[in-house]
Amino acid sequence: MKDRIYICHTYYHVYVTFLKELKLRAEADPARKAGTATLVLSKMSNNFENLKARVESTGLFEEVLEFDEKREDFFPELAKYRKDTGSFLGNLKNRIRFTKEYARLEAPYVPVDLRTYKDIYVYCDSDPIGYYLNQNRIRYH
């Protein structure tokens, strides 16, 4: 099992992640291998340009991945669940169906098996990755 994974959507998320990892490294046993975390950069909200290569050059992370997270309009089959049914219960049912289906459709785009990590840090769980984690009952911070 791997130690940690951070899923970042903004430069600020990456900044906070660096601070967390640097603190962990400072407190860690010197005999332990540094850089045991994975950093995932979601391309949905931000163009990180060459940040992936820059982060890799630091050696702070074992792995740096880009995540091509998909917006709901990428999947036209989800549109039917967004229509107003005219009733609270009908809309609630559609919302439940929407979240389940969205998580299923997003799954092929998730770049790693998140179940192989002890700790998962997600800064923005209202994005598709949050639906995926919740529907698959994967615990995260």
Regions found by a protein language model. Give the residues of each.
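Active-site and donor-binding regions of nucleotide-sugar-utilizing enzymes
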Residues: I5-H141
